[in-house]
Amino acid sequence: HRSTAAEVFHTPLDQVTPDQRRMAKVINFGLIYGMSAFGLAQQMGLDRQVAAAYVDEYFHKFPGVKRYMEKTRAQAAEDGYVETAFGRRLWVPDITAPRPMVRAAAERAAINAPMQGTAADIIKRAMIAVDAWLRTEKLQAKLLLQVHDELIVEAPAEEIELVKQKLPELMAGAAKLSVPLIADVGVGA
């Protein structure tokens, strides 16, 4: 989100403020979810023309995003589904609905589904890898819970360092993408 803020707000990366990063996060996720300049203005408390300028600048700086959105929308309308990066089909039955509001919601879902679905596929692969490693190593640590892109593992004190070291490697290795996956680990009570 910091690099988006740097591009959209014409600010050096190391000078991006927390507020600019927060706004860039709203822009990044909002536009992918189909938010209009009007919605962006409301969400961020901005004048509509200012929000529209941010949207224009975003698509100017990141033209691939607009191409992706248009291509995905057209593909979904033609096939009735979209796919994750791993080929899992996500059906979008309302993509050709005659009612514009229903169709627009399906278009937003079609654009978002490959990203959310791919993220879901990756975390599931990570869960399988972590569980297999815990079993193979015969550790007492247990995979307890998955929350969005996080895995919660319960480990006895004597296994914490080993799990802390191995978990990010297993999670980052869950998929080979053109952009590396980076996983952080935290320890808490």
What are these regions (language model features)?
Residues 1-189:
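Conserved catalytic core of nucleotide polymerization and phosphodiester-bond processing enzymes
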